[in-house]
Design a protein with these regions (language model features):
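Generic structural signal for well-ordered alpha-helices
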Residues: 284, 288, 321-324
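Sec-dependent N-terminal signal peptides
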Residues: 4-14
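N-terminal secretory targeting modules
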Residues: 9, 19-159, 164-182
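Conserved SGNH/GDSL esterase-like catalytic core that processes O-acyl groups on lipids
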Residues: 54-56, 129-131, 175-273, 309-318, ...
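Structural recognition of the beta-strand scaffold that forms the well-ordered cores
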Residues: 155-159, 164, 201-205, 244-249, ...
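Short, conserved loop/helix-junction motifs that constitute active-site signature segments
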Residues: 151, 241, 292-295
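Sec-exported extracytoplasmic/periplasmic mature domains
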Residues: 164, 198, 202, 251, ...
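Extracellular serine-dependent O-acyl
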Residues: 298-306, 312-373
């Protein structure tokens, strides 16, 4: 009898110990589970490890019942940076610097398990820094993701270059622009505009790119329809996410390279010599026409700035305005707009966060007055 009782007691204590361990342990919440909400052009070939490429790509979720949050990522080069925003505290993000390969990042450790927390994991950097695979999160056992029915938000997509990416915007000196740590799409004019206006945001931008010529062998008309900029066979499904508003900010790189006759990219793109004004306008019209084909109902805002392509005496604003005027006249496209950002008069480097805030203010005002009214 005593022996039986003793065995039963030992068995009970062992089960209790295992139960406590289970309750105090952790669990993996895989990236393909319900409760994760993704934003951006993402490669879901492996649903348990979706690949993030573009700046501004993000995943949002709400969890409850956990004191900790760990994020599982696999980074290609160890050069990407993410903002982790807890409970919409936009001004105080957790800065996550990726290490190369598969890593687990302990982001929060002392949360109140009795509360719910909203989280956004936002890619600050771009495809130049390589891909990042999101492999899920780790929470305390017993925690779960909240299923949230989200109201529809108007959608906005930006097509642009390093200005839209946010290259060097956290480098006030202008001399360390190439440092990925100084690149923050979260504080680009594009992301600020979308966030402040409550728009669902997507950013299809790459530093150095142009409409006719780039600083490398790829131009926007060749890249705009790809899931990954360097993989032409991997095409984006434009029907999977349709924006209400499209903002195009291109021609800054063209404005330099059309005059650099010795540059190899210039030589390849302009075999017959420097392009004429008519050819430049036609190239812009062709690209906007490509966007119109895939987004027939979108309001398209053609912008430029705030670097020296919009400085006094430069013809590039005129090229864009002429292209839009011609498309309105001959294609009867009345859903085209133009907006030119004020020249920031910066002699070195890219627009800073201060410049981006001014650009965002200008764009927000324009959208409110002309499209979101």
């Amino acid at each position: 009898m005593k022996k039986t009782f003793l065995l039963a007691l030992i068995s009970f204590l062992w089960c209790f110990h295992q139960s406590c361990q289970a309750q105090t342990g952790t669990q993996l919440v895989a990236a393909n589970q319900n409760g994760f909400y993704y934003h951006g052009r993402i490669n879901f070939a492996n649903p348990k490890a979706p690949e993030f490429y573009w700046p501004g790509t993000s995943v949002d979720f709400i969890f409850r019942g956990s004191k900790l949050l760990k994020i599982l990522l696999e980074d290609e080069k160890g050069k990407n940076y993410f903002n982790v925003i807890l409970n919409n505290q936009y001004a105080k993000p957790y800065l996550l610097k990726c290490q190369k390969g598969k890593k687990k990042y302990a982001v929060y450790n002392n949360l109140d398990a009795g509360k719910s927390y909203s989280v956004s994991i936002f890619k600050r950097t771009e495809t130049d820094e390589g891909y990042t695979k999101f492999m899920g999160i780790e929470l305390d056992n017993g925690a779960d993701l909240a299923m949230v029915k989200r109201a529809y938000s108007p959608r906005i997509e930006f097509f642009g270059n390093s200005i839209t990416v946010g290259m060097g915007n956290e480098d006030p000196t202008g001399r360390d622009n190439m440092n990925p740590a100084k690149k923050n799409n979260y504080l680009s004019y594009a992301a600020i505009t979308a966030r402040d206006l409550g728009l669902d945001y997507r950013c299809t931008a790459k530093s150095g790119i142009g409409v006719m010529v780039s600083w490398y062998d790829l131009i926007m008309p060749e890249m705009y329809d790809r899931v990954h900029p360097d993989k032409p066979a991997l095409k984006h499904d434009f029907k999977s996410w349709i924006p209400d508003i499209v903002v195009v900010n291109l021609f800054q790189n063209d404005s330099w390279l059309v005059n650099m006759t010795r540059d190899p990219n210039h030589k390849k793109r302009f075999k017959q010599g420097k392009p004429t004004a008519q050819q430049i306008v036609k190239a812009y019209m062709n690209f906007i026409s490509n966007l119109r084909k895939v987004y027939p109902k979108a309001k398209i805002v053609c912008t430029l700035g705030s670097m020296n392509a919009v400085s006094p005496g430069k013809p590039w604003k005129g090229y864009i305005q002429q292209a839009v005027n011609l498309m309105k006249k001959y294609y009867k496209d009345q859903q085209l707009y133009t907006l030119f950002f004020a020249y920031n008069n910066r002699k070195i480097g890219h627009p800073t966060v201060t410049d981006h805030i001014k650009m965002a203010d200008q764009l927000k005002k324009f959208l409110k007055q002309n499209i979101l009214k």
